[in-house]
């Protein structure tokens, strides 16, 4: 009997789709990049983040570390490619996305955000510490 992907803590495979700046698909599995916020598609910054990410990672091999949470149809975790390293940190460094403080409680992206400067996009209320 196969093990459910939802029970896995690590997922590896090709990136097949970029939904937007903070959601990718590895194979057929949607991953919400944890600790990251990007403006929505349909906004200038959101469209730039999505287009940039598509150019950088489609068909690249990713390793994702899942945290066991779900949001809508997506699993939640941090993903990296050999070319970019941590995708979230890379998008912050490019000033295309920002740190979502509430979901980066261990501060993994804190230094990346400090180096990049203030995020120019909108920080949603759910990113503020509760």
Give, region by region, the residue ranges found by the protein language model.
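Small beta-barrel nucleic-acid-binding modules, primarily SNase/OB-fold domains
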Residues: 2-130
């Amino acid at each position: 009997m196969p093990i459910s992907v939802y029970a896995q803590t690590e997922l590896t495979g090709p990136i097949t789709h970029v939904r937007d700046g903070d959601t990718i698909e590895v194979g057929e599995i949607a991953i919400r990049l944890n600790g990251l916020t990007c403006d929505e598609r349909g906004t200038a910054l959101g469209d730039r983040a999505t287009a940039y990410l598509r150019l950088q990672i489609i068909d690249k091999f990713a390793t994702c570390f899942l945290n066991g949470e779900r949001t809508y149809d997506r699993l939640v975790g941090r993903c990296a490619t050999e070319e970019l390293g941590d995708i979230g940190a890379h998008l912050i460094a490019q000033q295309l996305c920002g740190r979502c403080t509430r979901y980066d409680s261990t501060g993994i992206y804190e230094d990346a955000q400090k180096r990049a400067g203030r995020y120019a996009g909108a920080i949603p209320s759910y990113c503020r510490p509760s």
